[in-house]
Design a protein with these regions (language model features):
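N-terminal helix-turn-helix DNA-binding core of bacterial DNA-binding proteins
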Residues: 3-42, 64-77
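A conserved amphipathic terminal alpha-helix motif
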Residues: 79-95
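Generic cytosolic/nucleocytoplasmic N-terminal low-complexity/intrinsically disordered segments
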Residues: 45-47, 81
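Base-recognition residues in the alpha-helical recognition helix of bacterial helix-turn-helix
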Residues: 22, 47-51
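Alpha-helical residues within the helix-turn-helix
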Residues: 37, 54-55
Length: 95
């Protein structure tokens, strides 16, 4: 039986995927090429991370002409908010 929560935790365990998720959240949507231009990784690496995030139900792909744009799902947006809140909490504790 699939473990959806385990898939989400596995996807979010990688700092690069958390960065991809945050970038999409800020912009509303992004292509793999746009993400590769702002992150220190290749387009192929970004595509692999996007596939993992999509498999976990955090992002969805939408074909627009020759490009595929990725946006957060409702679940992805909720997890992004939770991660932001956790980061603020941890920064407050260390300062």
């Amino acid at each position: 039986m699939p473990d959806p929560l385990g898939q989400v935790f596995s996807a979010l365990a990688d700092p690069s995927r958390r960065h991809v998720l945050g970038s999409i959240a800020q912009a509303g949507s992004r292509t793999a090429t746009e993400l590769a231009g702002e992150l220190p990784m290749t387009r192929q690496a970004v595509s692999k991370h996007l596939t993992t995030l999509a498999d976990a139900g955090l992002v969805e792909a939408e074909r627009q002409g020759r490009e595929t744009r990725y946006h957060l799902t409702q679940v992805g947006a909720e997890w992004d908010d939770r991660l932001d809140a956790l980061a603020r909490h941890l920064r407050g504790r260390s300062g």
